[in-house]
């Protein structure tokens, strides 16, 4: 009727990687990305990456965009900042000054009189700078393509990184364009674009 005693010492297993103090479990234990990082940290004690990957990772999480709303597409551009879509959760926050912006969203019809102002604002943005062309009018003139006063695509004035089609494109389409831009930034090196 006695309890058998063992002479072996019981040792609690050591958790691997970065431990969340609130739960006591490894951070992101269900996420494959964090699982890979935790395994590498537990194995080596440090992470190995290139400077390009680190800089591009930081860029994608802190993109500041400047609005260049010219027509009805600007309403959808404003909607993407509202709580339903909340683009700021992806590290994409609005700024009012071109000197603090990384991304310019051209939304709407670009006229010949507005084209020099667009180029001037683009030139004031620091490098690296990116441009999203939003809507049919910004992409190729749209409904006003044959008008004498409309530029047939803002790519004639500034280089475009992402085109978002639609008249007007939905907020989901703009959000998808932002995610594509982040993917493009992660894919490129820091020296060449």
From Swiss-Prot:
Co-factor note (free text): Binds 1 [4Fe-4S] cluster.
Entry's localization field: Cell inner membrane
GO CC terms of this entry: plasma membrane; respiratory chain complex I
EC identifiers of the protein: 7.1.1.-
Keyword Zinc-finger: no
Domain of life: Bacteria
Residue ranges of the TM segments: none
Major localisation: membrane
Pfam families reported for this sequence: Oxidored_q6
MF terms (GO), sorted A to Z: 4 iron, 4 sulfur cluster binding; iron ion binding; NADH dehydrogenase (ubiquinone) activity; NADH:ubiquinone reductase (non-electrogenic) activity; quinone binding
Cofactor(s) for this UniProt protein: [4Fe-4S] cluster
Binding sites annotated in the UniProt record for [4Fe-4S] cluster: 72-73, 137, 167
Record keywords: 4Fe-4S, Cell inner membrane, Cell membrane, Iron, Iron-sulfur, Membrane, Metal-binding, NAD, Quinone, Translocase, Transport, Ubiquinone
Keyword Cell inner membrane carried by entry: yes
UniProt membrane topology term: Peripheral membrane protein
Gene Ontology process terms (BP): aerobic respiration; electron transport coupled proton transport
Database matches in NCBIfam families: nuoB_fam, PRK06411.1
Xref: PANTHER family: NADH DEHYDROGENASE, NADH DEHYDROGENASE [UBIQUINONE] IRON-SULFUR PROTEIN 7, MITOCHONDRIAL
Protein name: NADH-quinone oxidoreductase subunit B
Species the sequence originates in: Rhizobium rhizogenes (strain K84 / ATCC BAA-868) (Agrobacterium radiobacter)
């Amino acid at each position: 009727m006695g309890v058998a005693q063992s002479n072996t010492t019981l040792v609690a297993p050591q958790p691997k990687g970065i431990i969340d103090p609130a739960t006591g479990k490894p951070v992101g234990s269900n996420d494959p990305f964090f699982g890979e990082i935790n395994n590498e940290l537990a194995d080596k004690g440090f992470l190995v990456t290139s400077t390009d990957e680190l800089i591009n990772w930081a860029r994608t999480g802190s993109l500041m965009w400047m609005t260049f709303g010219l027509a009805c597409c600007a309403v959808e551009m404003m909607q993407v900042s509202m709580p339903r879509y909340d683009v700021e959760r992806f590290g994409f926050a609005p700024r009012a000054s071109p000197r603090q912006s990384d991304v310019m969203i051209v939304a709407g019809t670009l006229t010949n009189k507005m084209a020099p102002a667009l180029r001037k604002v683009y030139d004031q943005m620091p490098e690296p700078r990116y441009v999203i062309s939003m809507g049919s009018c910004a992409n190729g003139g749209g409904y006003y393509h044959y008008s004498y006063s409309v530029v047939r695509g803002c790519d004639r004035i500034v280089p475009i990184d992402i085109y978002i089609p639609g008249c007007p494109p939905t907020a989901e389409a703009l959000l998808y364009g932002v995610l594509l831009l982040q993917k493009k930034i992660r894919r490129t090196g820091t020296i060449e674009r």
